[in-house]
Amino acid sequence: MIIEVLICTIGRGIEKAAEVLTLPRNDVRYLISFQYSDSSELDYIPDKLKSRKDVHVISVRSCGLSANRNNAMKHSTGDIILFADDDNRYTWKDFDNIADAFENNAYADAICFRSATYDGNFSREFPSVSFELCSPPKGYYVRSCEIALRRNSKFPEFDTNFGLGSDVLACGEEEVFIHDLIKQGFKAIYCPVTIVCTAASTTGSFFFKKSSVRRSKGAVLAVIHGYWGALPRIMKYALFNVKGMSRLSALHDMYCGVVYAKKIGRC
């Protein structure tokens, strides 16, 4: 079983990508999807990446994190693929945990795991037991670095309307991807095992600071629950979860996300 780590980076982020690598092992490879806007940026690729036989760098002139992840998936060849950013850190034990989970859950097409911060603490609260992602517990959400897939060319792509670099919706691409995957009949589960260390903050954690994140919240709810199902949910969220800013402003932005999801045909 070959595990392939798909590292998505842009610009000078490629200089940090080498820090994601562990010591070489026969069953682990790395594919780096490197987005650039000017050919001069190709000089940013460090020699350490060029010298590793287990590393393959794919350079692509494009923008948007979802497009970058799609490019990485398109060029992947491993049996198991997992998504990484240039600030993720792995150990050999992490890879062993991933391989064991897929061997023990042969029916699973996708497994979502736990992530930890650099100091070893969980990045947030996680459920302590496994479950199928078609019926997740209340409050659960997934980060891209927690997703591992049994590679399949029929998997859906990440929706490029969502994620960093998109015009309107700054995040939510992971939740939409998992939703689309399950909707197409693939089996996805959660496994309470830690597989990666990463930064504690995410784009989604800026809900109170960025309107694009608030729009994303509404749009994701619309994709998952439909237009009419999203409306009571954003109202409830604004009433009980919004603090430190105008509830009406937050509700307005989330509603704009719901409307946008309908406009682009996602609900």
Descriptions of predicted regions:
Residues 119, 131-150, 162, 168-169:
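A recurrent flexible, glycine/aromatic-enriched loop bordering the glycosyltransferase active site
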Residues 17-59:
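Acidic donor-binding segment of Leloir-type glycosyltransferases
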Residues 81:
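Short aromatic/hydrophobic "clamp" motif used to bind/position activated sugar donors
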Residues 163-179:
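Acidic donor-binding loop at a coil-to-helix junction in glycosyltransferase catalytic cores
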Residues 160, 185-197, 209-210:
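Catalytic beta-strand/loop signature of glycosyltransferases that borders the donor
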